[in-house]
Amino acid sequence: MKNTTLPTLLLSLALAAAPAAVHAQATVVQTPYKHPKALFDIYLDHPAKMGAALYWLRSFVNPLLEAPYSFFNDDMSVIVVLHGTELVTVAKKNEAKYEEVVQRMRYYAGQGVKFKVCGLALKDYGYTLTDMQPFIEVTPSAMTELVHWQNQGYGLITPLVTDKRFSIEEIR
């Protein structure tokens, strides 16, 4: 005859714990963040996606500005490097077309976020320094800029902006 005492005991314990697990809930964790350094690499296939890419920035910055962290500009360092089609959103002549996106970038620039544009892409698009918004800094190359800041200890975040096929309500 087989000894089934241990498996039976384990099954009984699992079944006894199941109702408690159903009524359990998630817990909030307050990770003790200290002086975060983030580098956003933005390279989009369509300028209309810039708004969605900025939600990645919001998801990083806003929780750090609010309690319990309440960081100030000098408590964190955030750099955004633009080098794709989104470059047109920071051209002064396109401000009316991308007004909401520009206002959001201007807000974050006021919070200490640095917005940098690839100088090579700037030339490729036929823009000059005077064509750019005042909060923009132009770097020699996005690639060298990204490597430089990663070598300084910045964490790289590359927003992935896909086409939205379903509303939140449809998939909830």
Protein language model features and the residues they cover:
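Positively charged n-region of N-terminal signal peptides that target proteins for export
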Residues: 1-5
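Sec/Tat signal peptide C-region and signal peptidase I cleavage site
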Residues: 20-24
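Acidic/histidine-rich, surface-exposed loop or edge segments in extracytoplasmic proteins
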Residues: 32-45, 82-87
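Structural recognition of the beta-strand scaffold that forms the well-ordered cores
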Residues: 38-41, 79-82, 114-117, 157-158
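Histidine-anchored nucleotide/phosphate-binding helix
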Residues: 51-71
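Acidic helix-start/capping segments at beta-turn-to-alpha-helix junctions
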Residues: 71-90
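A cross-taxonomic marker for long C-terminal extensions/tails that follow the last structured domain
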Residues: 88-172
